Amino acid sequence: MSKDLLKYLSTAPVLLTAWMSLTAGMIIEIQRFFPDSLSF
C-alpha cells in the first residue's frame, strides 16, 4: 500500500505540471488565432 501511495505522490505533480502546461499552451494558441474569444 505504501509503495503504491509513494508512486502516486511522485507521479501526480508531474502529471499536473504536464497537464497545466498543455492547457496553457492550448489557451495561448487559441488566443493567438482568436484574440477576442476570451473577452465576454
UniProtKB/Swiss-Prot annotation:
Is Iron there in the keyword field? no
Bilayer-crossing residues are: 12-34
Q: Where in the cell is it found?
A: Plastid, Chloroplast thylakoid membrane
Q: What membrane topology does the annotation report for this chain?
A: Single-pass membrane protein
What domain of life?
A: Eukaryota
Q: Per the UniProt entry, what are the Gene Ontology biological process annotations, in alphabetical order?
A: photosynthesis
Q: Which family does it belong to?
A: Belongs to the PsaJ family.
HAMAP family according to UniProt: PSI_PsaJ (MF_00522)
Protein name per UniProt:
Photosystem I reaction center subunit IX
Q: State the species of origin.
A: Emiliania huxleyi (Coccolithophore)
- Give the classification, highest ranks: Eukaryota, Haptista, Haptophyta, Prymnesiophyceae, Isochrysidales
